[in-house]
Swiss-Prot record:
Pathway(s) where this gene product acts: Pyrimidine metabolism; dTTP biosynthesis
Protein name in the entry: Thymidylate synthase
Homology family: Belongs to the thymidylate synthase family. Bacterial-type ThyA subfamily.
Function noted in UniProt: Catalyzes the reductive methylation of 2'-deoxyuridine-5'-monophosphate (dUMP) to 2'-deoxythymidine-5'-monophosphate (dTMP) while utilizing 5,10-methylenetetrahydrofolate (mTHF) as the methyl donor and reductant in the reaction, yielding dihydrofolate (DHF) as a by-product. This enzymatic reaction provides an intracellular de novo source of dTMP, an essential precursor for DNA biosynthesis.
Organismal lineage: Bacteria, Bacillati, Bacillota, Bacilli, Bacillales
Active site: C161
Enzyme class: transferase
InterPro entries: Thymidate_synth/dCMP_Mease, Thymidate_synth/dCMP_Mease_dom, Thymidate_synth/dCMP_Mease_sf, Thymidylate_synthase, Thymidylate_synthase_AS
Catalytic activity: dUMP + (6R)-5,10-methylene-5,6,7,8-tetrahydrofolate = 7,8-dihydrofolate + dTMP
Amino acid sequence: MTQFDKQYNSIIKEIIKNGISDEEFDVRTKWESDGTPAHTLSIITKQMRFDNSEVPILTTKKVAWKTAIKELLWIWQLKSNDVTELNKMGVHIWDQWKQEDGSIGHAYGFQLAKKNRNLNGEKVDQVDYLLHQLKNNPSSRRHITMLWNPDELDSMALTPCVYETQWYVKQGKLHLEVRARSNDMALGNPFNVFQYNVLQRMIAQVTGYELGEYIFNIGDCHVYTRHIDNLKIQMEREQFEAPKLWINPEVKDFYDFTIDDFKLINYKHGDRLSFEVAV
């Protein structure tokens, strides 16, 4: 059993047992297959915490880990909102939200690309500012990135689920706290928890720090009603030891990472489970 499997199953059980239904409301989300309202059971403010002795990835089902990393590179390295660039990587998870111009509007990578931070008289974006400050001002309590821009929320195809990171350097270790306003536990959470841990490992490597703790905070923690049956099946499955994540140690520049610089070794997992998408 992995740390992630244990915490994940605990939260799923709590949601199914004690979650509050939103069926009394006219919800925004609709089922992609038939357009009917996609209702949820939810609880609020849950935290997952990892000591980084293992990579947090589920073993009770197959997680498309390469797809998760490609999405991460699209947002954090390319700082892109162009879905066609993601399609070129063979990833289509954002196709449902693609606008007429091929983008997701002013969401995710668009916010990271904005050069709105001052650094030695030059305007830089959030990622470059973070990398510089972690290396040159490690004791700062201001190592934060933010995707939630109130002035541009109406220009986003989808407002960001994971919206904030805060980084801490303590005794030579790089700790990461991630905040998600909302997490779909069947589909979004397994991706987000894994990919932001990969980001922590990438940035620790290029800034020269050891890995510290990884904390993932969720505001609205929910399960869609059509996902419950398969989640119950998933929780009963055999659990395996965590795999090892290899990241090419030769990469010293954040922008030099490619998908070929990552390998997930000895990833044993249950079969893939199908969960319908709510849009």
